């Protein structure tokens, strides 16, 4: 079992385990934050009120290609960004009215994940925790990344991670799953329990 992390990791520590932060503040995220916070009628019928809700960004023409272009230097150590195709794009919205704001340990159904923080206001908690190195079994160092509005976290989909509980505030994000064109298995996912 990995040791508990107590503080947010700096960008150098995150980069050492294969997680890169990219500044995307030049893009206008306000409309996308609003879209993330509005529950579609279909999802309203399916979602549990106590859970973070997700909206499908593929239907809303989210600028995924532009995000990938701006994150290309962060993606390049993993693969040539031109080899990637968008597998899925969705938003998540967390607020203190929800009863469960965690996302248990998991590996994403992607080769590369780009997680864009659309909005973060007065947030306590709600960090993304990474377990070990991206190519490991989840043991070893455990690092926590703060989600900063207008910034993206870029990581390998295989990197074991989870979202810690939101104690207070509001956070919305866009999650982009990218797979390699023509490669089978990039979309395999693993879901485990929450690690205290």
Specify the residue positions occupied by each region the protein language model found.
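Catalytic core of non-heme Fe(II) oxygenases with the double-stranded beta-helix
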Residues: 79-195
């Amino acid at each position: 079992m990995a040791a508990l992390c107590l503080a947010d990791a700096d960008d150098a520590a995150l980069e050492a385990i294969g997680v890169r932060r990219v500044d995307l503040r030049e893009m206008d995220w306000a409309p996308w934050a609003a879209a993330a916070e509005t529950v579609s009628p279909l999802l309203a019928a399916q979602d549990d009120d106590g859970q973070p809700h997700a909206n499908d960004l593929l239907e809303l023409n989210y600028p995924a290609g532009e995000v990938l272009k701006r994150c290309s230097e962060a993606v390049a150590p993993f693969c040539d960004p031109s080899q990637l195709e968008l597998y899925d794009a969705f938003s998540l919205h967390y607020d203190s009215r929800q009863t469960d704001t965690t996302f248990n340990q998991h590996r994403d159904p992607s080769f590369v994940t780009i997680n864009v923080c659309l909005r973060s206001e007065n947030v306590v908690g709600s960090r993304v925790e990474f377990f070990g190195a991206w190519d490991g079994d989840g043991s070893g160092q455990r690092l926590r990344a703060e989600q900063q509005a207008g910034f993206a976290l870029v990581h390998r989909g295989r990197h074991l991670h989870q979202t810690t509980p939101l104690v207070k505030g509001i956070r919305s994000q866009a999650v982009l799953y990218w797979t390699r064109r023509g490669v089978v298995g990039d979309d395999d996912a693993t879901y485990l329990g929450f690690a205290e």
